[in-house]
């Protein structure tokens, strides 16, 4: 239904971003690896989206390019993997990092992601490897994977709280999220920086 949005960023509350298109505000869930690349509030952004309809909600998931969206759609076809878990997977790893982990059968790397146990990791490897064979070889080499070090927004007083809330939204338990953030917290860090560093440290 809604495959692409081009509009002005109104608010960024990781992992959610509010984009205004033609006077309508769309709330979009984005993996943190994509969220890092968004421009600041007030600037224009283009987001490729996947629309999910549930009994209790209609949700938009957003990505910086079609390759990331394709990988997300393949992930949610896997038994036991829903949109929330797929979002967490692509927040902990970039698209290319995930593809590499699957191709190398790195179960140990996958089980470090929230919500991924050994059985789910093994199932992902088996099912996703088969799917990759039917896709173009360069499908999952998006440019976004090369720009994870882009500048984050200025630090705010509640950056740590925002970072903890984002990690909880991605599937980490509150106590675990707090511990992850406290390990890498520093006064001058923005919430996006804290989230990025906490996820990297977890892997």
Swiss-Prot record:
Sequence motif Acidic pin, residues: 55-56
Region (N-terminal proteolytic domain, tetramerizes and binds DNA, does not bind RuvB): 1-144
Main location: cytoplasm
Consequence the record notes for mutating residue 110 to A: Does not complement deletion, tetramerizes, binds RuvB, does not bind DNA, no migration by RuvA-RuvB
One MF term in the entry's GO annotations: four-way junction helicase activity
Stretches for region Domain III: 156-203
Range of residues in the leader sequence: none
SMART domains (UniProt xref): HhH1
Details of cofactor binding: Branch migration by the RuvA-RuvB complex requires Mg(2+).
Region ranges (Flexible linker): 143-155
Keyword Cytoplasm carried by entry: yes
Deleted gene: phenotype: Sensitive to radiation, filamentous growth after transient inhibition of DNA synthesis, little effect on conjugal recombination in wild-type strains. Increased sensitivity to mitomycin and UV light. Suppresses lethality in recB-recC and dnaB temperature-sensitive mutants.
Known outcome of mutating residue 172 to A: Does not complement deletion, tetramerizes, does not bind RuvB, dominant negative to wt
Effect ascribed to mutating residue 164 to I: Defective RFR, UV light resistant, resistant to MMC, may interact poorly with RuvB
HAMAP family, per the entry: DNA_HJ_migration_RuvA
Domain notes: Has three domains with a flexible linker between the domains II and III, and assumes an 'L' shape. Domain III has weak interactions with the adjacent subunit. In complex with Holliday junction (HJ) DNA, an approximately square planar DNA molecule is bound to the tetramer's concave face, with the DNA accessible to solution on one side. Domain III moves 4-5 Angstroms toward the protein-DNA interface upon DNA binding. The isolated N-terminus (domains I and II) forms tetramers and binds HJ DNA but does not bind RuvB.
Subunit structure: Homotetramer. Forms a stable RuvA-RuvB-Holliday junction (HJ) complex in the presence of non-hydrolyzable (d)NTPs; in the presence of hydrolyzable (d)NTPs branch migration occurs. In electron microscopic images the complex is formed by 2 oppositely facing RuvB hexamers sandwiching possibly 2 RuvA tetramers at cruciform DNA structures. In E.coli X-ray structures only 1 RuvA tetramer binds to HJ (complex I); however in M.leprae and T.thermophilus, 2 RuvA tetramers bind the HJ (complex II).
Family the entry assigns: Belongs to the RuvA family.
Protein name stated in the entry: Holliday junction branch migration complex subunit RuvA
Organism: Escherichia coli (strain K12)
Record gene name: ruvA
């Amino acid at each position: 239904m809604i495959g692409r949005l081009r509009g002005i960023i109104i608010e960024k509350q990781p992992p959610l971003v509010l984009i205004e298109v033609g006077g309508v505000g769309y709330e979009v869930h984005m993996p943190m690896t994509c969220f890092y690349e968004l421009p600041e509030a007030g600037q224009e952004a283009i987001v490729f989206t996947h629309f999910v309809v549930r009994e209790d909600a209609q949700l938009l998931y957003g990505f910086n390019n079609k390759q990331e969206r394709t990988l997300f759609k393949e992930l949610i076809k896997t038994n036991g993997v829903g949109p929330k878990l797929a979002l967490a997977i692509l927040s902990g790893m970039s698209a290319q990092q995930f593809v590499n982990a699957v191709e190398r059968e790195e179960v140990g790397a996958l089980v470090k992601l929230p919500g991924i146990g050994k059985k789910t990791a093994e199932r992902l490897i088996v099912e996703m490897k088969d799917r990759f064979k039917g896709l173009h070889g360069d499908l999952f080499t998006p440019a976004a994977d090369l720009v994870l070090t882009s500048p984050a927004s200025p630090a705010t007083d509640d950056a740590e709280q925002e970072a903890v809330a984002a990690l909880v939204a991605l599937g980490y338990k509150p106590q675990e999220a707090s511990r992850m953030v406290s390990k890498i917290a520093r006064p001058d860090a923005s919430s996006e920086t804290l989230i990025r560093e906490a996820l990297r440290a977890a892997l």
